[in-house]
Each structure stands twice: as C-alpha cells, then as structure tokens.
C-alpha cells in the first residue's frame, strides 16, 4: 500500500499455488488479484512485462520476468530458484519456509528505487541467454547433419 500498487498473483501451477495465493490475498491490506486460469505464454509475458516487479517461486516466472526485463524477488524453495537468481544477477530472494515481511518490504523499496538499473541488467542477461540459445541451436543442427 506504500506505493499504491495492486498485487496480481499469477499461478504457474494453479492446483499447487491456489491455497498460498488465496491466503496471501486475504492477508493483504490492499487489493489483490489471482490469475489462475490457463493463459497463453504471450498473455503471461504481457502481465509480467507490465508489472513494476514480480515476486516468484516458480522457475518459469523468473525466466519470464528476466525475458521482459521486469525486476524479480525470488521465493526460494529449491536450489534451481537460487541458481536462476544467481544467473540473472538478482540478489533479492526470500526463503519459502520463513519469508520475513520486513525483508520483503526492504526489497520492494530497493527495487522501486532502482527499477531502471535492474531492468537494464536483466536486458543484458536476456541478451546473453538468447545468444547462448542461438549457439546451442547451431550446435544441435550441426550434430543432426553429421
């Protein structure tokens, strides 16, 4: 409520995420919405692109956020989440089993203050990832031709 931002929860795994997102919306003092229908990738990318920042615990959420240059706070429940946050150069993460609301607020403050810089950093990460994907595609095609 400090920044007058509405929370939109995007469920990448609706069956698993609904209980957690519902509880979060009930606990909020501001507005909260849950998108738990099956959305296309393009639609999800649009929602994430339009966000000020994303709080995500699903790997695809982090990947989508990086690809559209949206700052992200990772909720770490698995080493793959920490690995992706490290790869993206993003320091803001909370443990899933004990997220601290004061730490979360501090992360949100830092992201709001430094959003442009963080987005530029994510743009570089996305560009490098696209280059690696292209190199891998060329390598895969060369292996198929052999």
Task: Identify the residue ranges that each predicted region occupies.
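Active-site anion-handling motifs in enzyme catalytic cores
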Residues: 1-146
């Amino acid at each position: 409520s400090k920044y007058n931002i509405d929370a939109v929860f995007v469920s990448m795994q609706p069956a698993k995420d609904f209980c957690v997102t519902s509880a979060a919306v009930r606990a909020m003092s501001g507005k909260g919405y849950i998108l738990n229908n099956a959305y296309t990738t393009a639609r999800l990318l649009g929602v994430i692109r339009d966000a000020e920042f994303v709080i995500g615990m699903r790997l695809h959420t982090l990947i989508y956020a990086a690809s559209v240059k949206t700052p992200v706070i990772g909720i770490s429940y698995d080493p793959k989440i920490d690995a992706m946050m490290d790869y993206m150069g993003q320091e803001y993460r909370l443990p899933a089993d004990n997220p601290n609301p004061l730490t979360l607020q501090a992360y949100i403050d830092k992201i709001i203050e430094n959003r442009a810089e963080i987005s530029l950093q994510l743009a570089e990460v996305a560009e490098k990832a696209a280059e690696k994907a292209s190199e891998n595609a060329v390598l895969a095609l060369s292996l198929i031709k052999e």
